[in-house]
Amino acid sequence: GKIINKTVYLCVGLKQNGLKEVLGMWVGKSESSSFWMGVLTDLKARGVQDILITCTDNLNGFTDTIRTVFPQSSTQICVVHQIRNSCKYVVYKDKKEFTADMKNIYNAPNKEVAAAELNNLERKWGGKYPYAILSWRNNWDDLTVFFQFPLEIRK
């Protein structure tokens, strides 16, 4: 036999009652906007009428694809991916402290407090890691969409 690595992409929906439901699984060679266009049109063809909010890894073109198929959907960049991306710019000895400081941003109770925490992060680390901070600034609107929703949806 031969072992072949395959990637399976999973779409999970969160119902209004808080229950999660697997909407589908797709095997793909790579994440591309055309791949996701196929996934989203498949979901729509199978009856998905509305998506309140999506959470993506900020793949180039993915957000535009979502907005094409489900124009009313809000799109949130995945905070875990943002943290990983930010940490690429931080040396190992600072990562633990830097990550703890970032946690204050995404655990904030609202967008205003989150913005203040980002300012604190920039004051403390901006001189040493400007690109890590710039990544947050450049993506701020798409990183803070979830603050428009109740805590139950954010978790």
Regions found by a protein language model. Name each.
Residues 2, 12, 21, 25, ...:
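Flexible, active-site-adjacent loop/turn segments at secondary-structure boundaries
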Residues 7, 52, 76, 132-134, ...:
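Structural beta-strand/beta-sheet cores of well-ordered domains, especially the beta-sheet scaffolds
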Residues 108-155:
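Acidic/histidine-rich catalytic cores and adjacent linkers
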